[in-house]
């Protein structure tokens, strides 16, 4: 009985009390009966390092008890990192599910209501007769669930090759790589005269000059689409044009059936279909690759939870960043990736493929913690640095991410310095913090965190890196690919369908002229389109501003401000100021005299810290 009470106490810490009805308990994944009587103890009134705690014995006993009750369980939603189990782990999972349901309830109800209104409006206007009619999906609709609306230019410029290519440098930057002039081979050939006409040079010269880039979704060929739906497994070649200095598409290869290769010189509808097929693959990738942005911070937090006292300053910050984090896998398994669930209802490839994909990435070495540091990752793919080719003239994702991470890093540096004392060149305070060192050892040991800094942690810069990366994932990287991004950018129809509804062509010229017998045959019908937008709208979190849950609010929890002293409060004030400046610049974006924003014919705002939640929201 005592262990059950302790589990509930630990699970409730840092979370406001929630009244749980019996039906909620029954509906939330076998919530234990004792959780319905959860009481909440206050968060620590003072965060302190273990060596400064006057009650180290009780502190150590509390950690030992957590280790007994919070265990590493099997991975769920693909074979990646451990998911919590044990009495405390199960209670925390159930607690987070309830928090998630509470946060999502209004968004879900609003999106469903707006979906019904949108469908009624579309049908009253005669439905989709041309591609232009997809504007009926958005014009005047989704004002509450997606108050910022879809990206300016995403509809009006949807046939633009520059829009298509620049999405790789903004909405989905995690799959693009530059082909190294000597280390990478050309993935497929493109007819020489076509390359010459498009680029005024040769494919080999582009490669040798470091001007050739690849997105490879050929791995999707191993998955079988659902009945009545279809999918290619596209590879896309892109190039940096030496004349215009623009990043442009060169060719798309389908890798299925007769394996057609399309280029911008093809019939305009054939080429547009190729881009649609590519984007269908890309949407699958972004939605399932982002699962790693859940599992990586989860396992880092799990290791910390088993080794750090709740009174440790670092634990306080990590708990804040991991608000409701353990809801996503059980909720996803229950309603999104279950057979016939929301995924199967909307996407071409089945939920079984979606679950398999992140595990496949992880099995092939993906999901490394330090490898995911922003600049290290981008440099490894040749997107920054000039070792393998000329600099990209515009890289919207990196431009915004670099500034946001800079603000996070400044906060974390000040937080670490205020916690461990002014940095005088002696980082011995880190080595004396046995809880911190136990965390690093746990992460490298039982937790099996891939590519985590080695134990012992000797330099506070390493700790700053770790904390910065966790906060960047929860409040930045995740939202580039999920949260509000799909409904505003990467999932906007007609260019980004979740499923294709006609077979992949066996010859060019099969697209007609944009009538229902042409391109519309591959695209969702009116009801399917509304269902796609509704699902993606439910990923958005429109209320976080009113709830003080944005990235700007990440470190402003009252218990953290009260329990960490004036240095922490000053760091938070600086962070709020920095992110406010970033937010105002992003929110104020529009088109320049050339009709471009950050070099793109659409306005990208996915990293606005005053709009995004600070946590892993969905």
Curated annotation (Swiss-Prot):
Localization terms from the record: Secreted
Modifications the protein undergoes after translation, according to the UniProt entry: N- and O-glycosylated.
Residues of the Lipoxygenase domain: 47-618
Enzyme Commission number(s) of this protein: 1.13.11.-, 1.13.11.45
Region called Disordered, residue ranges: 36-58
Signal peptide (UniProt feature, chain positions): 1-16
Biased composition annotated in UniProt, kind: Low complexity: 36-45
Family: Belongs to the lipoxygenase family. Manganese lipoxygenase subfamily.
Chain's role: Lipoxygenase that metabolizes linoleic and alpha-linolenic acids to 11S- and 13R-hydroperoxy fatty acids. At the end of lipoxygenation, the intermediate product 11S-HPODE from linoleic acid is then transformed into 13R-HPODE as the final product. It also acts on alpha-linolenic acid producing 11S-HPOTrE and 13R-HPOTrE with subsequent transformation of 11S-HPOTrE to 13R-HPOTrE as final product.
The protein's name in its UniProt record: Manganese lipoxygenase
């Amino acid at each position: 009985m005592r262990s059950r009470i302790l589990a509930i106490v630990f699970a409730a810490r840092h979370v406001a009390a929630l009244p749980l009805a019996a039906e909620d308990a029954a509906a939330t994944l076998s919530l234990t009966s004792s959780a319905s009587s959860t009481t909440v103890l206050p968060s620590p009134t003072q965060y302190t390092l273990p060596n400064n705690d006057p009650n180290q014995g009780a502190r150590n006993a509390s950690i030992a008890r957590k280790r007994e009750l919070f265990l590493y369980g099997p991975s769920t939603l693909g074979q990646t990192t451990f998911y919590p189990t044990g009495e405390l782990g199960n209670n925390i999972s159930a607690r987070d599910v309830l928090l998630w349901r509470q946060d999502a309830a209004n968004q879900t109800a609003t999106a469903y209501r707006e979906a019904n209104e949108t469908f009624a409006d579309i049908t009253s206007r005669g439905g989709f007769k041309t591609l232009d009619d997809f504007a009926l999906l958005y014009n005047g609709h989704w004002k509450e669930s997606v108050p910022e609306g879809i990206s300016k230019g995403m509809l009006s410029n949807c046939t633009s090759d520059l829009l298509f290519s620049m999405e790789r440098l903004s909405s989905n930057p995690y799959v693009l790589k530059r082909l190294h002039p000597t280390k990478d081979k050309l993935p497929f050939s493109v007819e020489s005269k076509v390359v010459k006409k498009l680029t005024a040079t040769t494919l080999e010269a582009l490669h040798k000059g470091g001007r050739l880039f690849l997105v490879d979704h050929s791995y999707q060929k191993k998955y079988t689409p659902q009945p009545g739906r279809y999918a290619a497994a596209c590879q896309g070649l892109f190039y940096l044009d030496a004349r215009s200095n623009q990043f442009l598409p060169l060719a798309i290869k389908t890798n299925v059936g007769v394996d057609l290769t399309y280029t911008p010189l093809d019939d305009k509808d054939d080429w547009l279909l190729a881009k649609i097929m590519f984007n269908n693959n890309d949407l699958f990738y972004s939605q399932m690759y982002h699962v790693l942005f859940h599992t990586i911070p989860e396992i880092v937090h799990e290791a910390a939870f088993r080794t750090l006292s709740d009174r440790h300053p670092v634990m306080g910050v990590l708990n804040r960043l991991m608000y409701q984090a353990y809801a996503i896998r059980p909720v996803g398994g229950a309603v999104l990736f279950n057979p016939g669930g929301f995924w199967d209802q909307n996407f071409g490839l089945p939920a079984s493929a979606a679950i398999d994909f992140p595990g496949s990435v992880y099995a092939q070495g993906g999901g490394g913690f330090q490898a995911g540091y922003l600049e290290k990752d981008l440099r490894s793919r040749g997107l920054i640095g000039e070792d393998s080719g000329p600099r990209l003239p515009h890289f919207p994702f990196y431009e915004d991410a670099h500034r946001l991470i800079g603000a996070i890093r400044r906060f974390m540096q000040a937080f670490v310095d205020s916690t461990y004392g002014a940095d005088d060149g002696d980082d011995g305070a880190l080595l004396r913090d046995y809880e911190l060192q136990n965390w690093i050892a746990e992460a490298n040991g039982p937790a099996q965190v891939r590519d985590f800094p080695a134990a012992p942690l000797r330099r506070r810069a390493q700790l700053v890196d770790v904390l910065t990366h966790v906060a960047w994932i929860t409040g930045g990287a995740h939202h580039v690919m999920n949260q509000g991004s799909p409904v505003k950018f990467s999932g906007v129809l007609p260019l980004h369908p979740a499923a294709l509804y006609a077979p992949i062509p066996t010859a060019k010229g099969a697209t007609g002229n944009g009538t229902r017998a042409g391109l519309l045959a591959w695209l969702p019908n009116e009801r399917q389109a509304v269902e796609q937008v509704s699902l993606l709208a439910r990923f958005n979190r429109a209320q976080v501003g009113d709830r003080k849950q944005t990235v700007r609010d990440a470190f402003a929890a009252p218990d953290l401000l009260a329990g960490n002293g004036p240095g922490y409060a000053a760091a938070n004030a600086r962070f709020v100021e920095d992110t406010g400046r970033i937010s105002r610049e992003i929110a104020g974006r529009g088109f320049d005299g050339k009709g471009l924003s950050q070099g793109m014919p659409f306005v990208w705002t996915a990293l606005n810290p005053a709009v995004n939640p600070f946590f892993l929201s969905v």
